[in-house]
Curated annotation (Swiss-Prot):
GO BP terms, alphabetized: cell wall organization; peptidoglycan biosynthetic process; regulation of cell shape
GO cellular component: peptidoglycan-based cell wall; plasma membrane
Keyword Protein biosynthesis applies: no
Coiled coil: none
Pathway(s) the chain acts in: Cell wall biogenesis; peptidoglycan biosynthesis
Name of the protein in its database record: Biosynthetic peptidoglycan transglycosylase
Membrane-spanning residues: 15-35
Keywords linked to the UniProt accession: Cell inner membrane, Cell membrane, Cell shape, Cell wall biogenesis/degradation, Glycosyltransferase, Membrane, Peptidoglycan synthesis, Transferase, Transmembrane, Transmembrane helix
EC number(s) recorded for this UniProt protein: 2.4.99.28
GO MF, one annotated term: peptidoglycan glycosyltransferase activity
HAMAP family: PGT_MtgA
Amino acid sequence: MTATRRVSRPGPVRWMVYLGAVVAIAWLATQAFYFGQIAVWNYVNPQSTSFMRSDTWRLSQDRPDLSVQHTWVSYDQISRNLKRAIIASEDANFVNNNGYETDAILQAWERNKAKGKIVRGGSTITQQLARNLFLSREKSYIRKGQELIITWMLETLMDKERIFEIYLNSVEWGNGVYGAEAAAHYYYKTSASKLTAAQSARLAVMLPQPKYFDEHRGSQYLAQRARVIARRMGAAELPD
């Protein structure tokens, strides 16, 4: 008589191992995609970013008559005034840091812990670019961790000038307005290469809340903060 062979079924531990392996492979594939995309963008200009696509879709639902404004220009076609203003306002140590400002991250961590939720991120220019290129607006520690990984990739594969060039051409400056050239035409009827120091300072101050300042251009805070940034611009170090 032939003995019946029992087929063992995977137990819960084995299923957990399988699930962990699938998650790990998916995570590695995602990182490989990001890495490969950044490698390509070191030589090819990105036509859009994750933020631009999601933002323009949302705007198309709320304001279908709104036209998107975005024109890519080379790094040399952007006023040094604007470059200095943004560095003075957003990331004074941009040229010398490795994409992170540890003190700012720790300060943001303490504020977030006190609030019980993520309200600040302590982001450098490179971190902002990482977020705009690939990530959602969701605020979570998982997303922040992914942002730090992408930041490392950007700093590893690109020099500071290329990082700044992509940032300047993709950052949001109002409702449907992306990049320095579009912002210069939208607010001042000029090109990015001809922006004055005063105009550049105002544009730099708008960056954390571009939609708000698009609709509140007479804001007293905007005017006062722009004067502060204008005074700091002379000390801003550029990556060129």
